[in-house]
C-alpha cells in the first residue's frame, strides 16, 4: 500500500512540475521582452520552445470565442461596456436601489439617494492613530 502511495505522490509531483514548466516557460518568466526578441531574431527555431503566457492566452481566448455558446455572452458583455456611463446611471440622483424616492430633508439630515438612509457625518483630517 505504501509503495502505491509513494508512486502516486511521485506522479503527482511530476505532473505539477510539468504544468509549472508549461505555464512559466523555459526561463521562469524572467526573460524580458527585448531580450526574448533578440534571441528569437538570432534563433527563430526557439520560438516554438519559448511559449509565453500571452500566446497561451491568445490561443485560449481564440478557442473560447469560436465556440457558439460563448458568442452570445461575449457580445452581451462587450455591449454593456461600450455604452457604460452614457445612460445607465442617469437616475441615481432621483431613486435609490430599493425604488424609494428620497425625502425632502433639511441641512444635516441628508438622505443618501442610493440607499435611502440618512447620511452619516464622516470625520475628515489627519488620522489620530498615525503619529
Swiss-Prot record:
Subcellular location: Secreted
Biased composition (Basic residues): 76-97
Expression sites by tissue: Expressed in all aerial apical meristems, including the floral and inflorescence meristems in the reproductive phase and the shoot apical meristem in the vegetative phase. Also detected in the primordia of lateral organs such as the leaf and the floral organs.
UniProt entry keywords in alphabetical sequence: Developmental protein, Differentiation, Secreted, Signal
Keyword NAD: no
Keyword Secreted: yes
First-listed, main subcellular location of the protein, grouped into a coarse class: secreted
Region (Disordered): 67-131
GO CC annotations on file: extracellular region
Function: Involved in the maintenance of the floral meristem and of the shoot apical meristem in the vegetative phase. Suppresses the fon2 mutation and acts independently of FON1. In Oryza sativa subsp. japonica, the protein has a single amino acid substitution at the putative processing site of the signal peptide and is inactive.
PANTHER family, per database record: CLAVATA3/ESR (CLE)-RELATED PROTEIN 10, INACTIVE PROTEIN FON2 SPARE1
Family (UniProt): Belongs to the CLV3/ESR signal peptide family.
Identification of the protein by name: Protein FON2 SPARE1
Originating species: Oryza sativa subsp. indica
Name of the gene encoding the protein in the UniProt record: FOS1
